[in-house]
Amino acid sequence: MSIKLLPSLISRRRWLAAAALSGLLAACAPMPGAMPSSDPLPSWNEGANKQRIIDFVHAVSSEGGKDYVAPEERIAVFDNDGTLWAEQPMYFQFFFALDRVKALAAQHPEWRNKEPFASLLKGDVKAALAGGERAMLEIVMATHAGMTTDEFAQIVGDWAATARHPTTKRRFTEMVYQPMLEVLSYLRANGFKTFIVSGGGIEFMRAWADQ
């Protein structure tokens, strides 16, 4: 079963204003997370929260029960940043944008004296974002536009294969929460369609979500 990506309609106003890309729904391959049948959520601590999830899935998938939900109506929706993967010290798509500014700087010598790019090239993210949504929009437009969707997907894919989180030094695509991957797999195994709601760009997510 596939994951679907939906543009966020709530929170993250700055990023949404700058990075929400066109399209309502984009199918991606399932996230990894196969689990032993003896324990569908092995990374979860034993306790009430884990048991509630298991009880809920059992209740809605047990035909004839009072809480039974037909497979075609089983839908689960998840946030992405901070839920399925980490979001600190800032959204990962913005790390991508920062790296793109550095990669494109040689083609734009004027950026050395133009904000928000001048501050970014000096490593001062706080100063670069002092311009608010307008600054964010300039950064996104400069780093996400002017190419086909296939070209953008290739650039994002190459970045995801090499870029590292500044603290953990792990690839950004490895900064996922295993317990949540287990929930996704558990739900799919019981007939749920899973959806991701994100303030990030669909095309950005499409390039790595199948990993």
Go through the PLM ranges and name each one:
Residues 2-23:
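N-terminal secretory signal peptides and thylakoid transit peptides that target proteins
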Residues 26-27:
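C-terminal motif of bacterial Sec signal peptides marking the signal peptidase cleavage site
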Residues 35-211:
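Alpha-helical substrate-recognition element adjacent to the catalytic core
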